[in-house]
Amino acid sequence: MIRQNSYLILILTFKFRAQHSTYKLPVKGGTRYAPNIDLQEVEALATLMTFKLAIADVPFGGAKGGVKIDIRKYSQGEIERATRKYTMELIKKNFIGAQVDCLGPDMGTNEQVMTWIKDTYKNVKGE
């Protein structure tokens, strides 16, 4: 992400969501905001989530998401816009929803970020 004249430009944002095992739906996993996150890390974390859920006998597949952003460098409003954009991309690709993929917090995210995700999903899908 880059900031230009107080506008957040998302063209350069790297956003990821990996679903490791869709054998048992929905899949479940956290959403991480970190400046150095990449697709390989997200895929590895999704795989680990599958194993964690299996060990705990939770009947979900594993998933993990990531947004490449250093939250210390952006305002709350900018982080909100990035979160809502990420959520819209997940909706477009059917990577979010109670029957498909249950997102949760992880490093760099919190209750507020999860609320923005929920609100965006609810406003678009009406669920």
Language-model segments: residues:
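N-terminal ligand-binding/catalytic initiation module
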Residues: 1-127
